[in-house]
């Protein structure tokens, strides 16, 4: 599968990412590079590999489960198209 410039433009629009027209060929190239890597994964022999196992026997690192305030409100709201009084503002959807 090959990604052309129009497909790259459509993906950027769907992802709500502003991409200038002169950057679209590079973006399409990056998409094609990613898809090429994914196609290489199809060549890996996984017949004898159990699903959901790791290639190295490791336990996951665990952390203490504590409640925090997160302190991320400003960072999260900086991505919002419209934020008011510390909350996401969205159009009314119910009459």
Swiss-Prot record:
GO terms for molecular function: asparaginyl-tRNA synthase (glutamine-hydrolyzing) activity; ATP binding; glutaminyl-tRNA synthase (glutamine-hydrolyzing) activity. It comes from the Bacteria. InterPro entries: Asp/Glu-ADT_sf_sub_c, GatC. One of its GO terms (biological process) is glutaminyl-tRNAGln biosynthesis via transamidation. Keywords: ATP-binding, Ligase, Nucleotide-binding, Protein biosynthesis. Its EC number is 6.3.5.-. It catalyses: L-glutamyl-tRNA(Gln) + L-glutamine + ATP + H2O = L-glutaminyl-tRNA(Gln) + L-glutamate + ADP + phosphate + H(+); L-aspartyl-tRNA(Asn) + L-glutamine + ATP + H2O = L-asparaginyl-tRNA(Asn) + L-glutamate + ADP + phosphate + 2 H(+). Pfam families: GatC (PF02686). Allows the formation of correctly charged Asn-tRNA(Asn) or Gln-tRNA(Gln) through the transamidation of misacylated Asp-tRNA(Asn) or Glu-tRNA(Gln) in organisms which lack either or both of asparaginyl-tRNA or glutaminyl-tRNA synthetases. The reaction takes place in the presence of glutamine and ATP through an activated phospho-Asp-tRNA(Asn) or phospho-Glu-tRNA(Gln). Heterotrimer of A, B and C subunits. PANTHER family: GLUTAMYL-TRNA(GLN) AMIDOTRANSFERASE SUBUNIT C, MITOCHONDRIAL. This is Aspartyl/glutamyl-tRNA(Asn/Gln) amidotransferase subunit C. It comes from Dinoroseobacter shibae (strain DSM 16493 / NCIMB 14021 / DFL 12). The lineage of its organism: Bacteria, Pseudomonadati, Pseudomonadota, Alphaproteobacteria, Rhodobacterales.
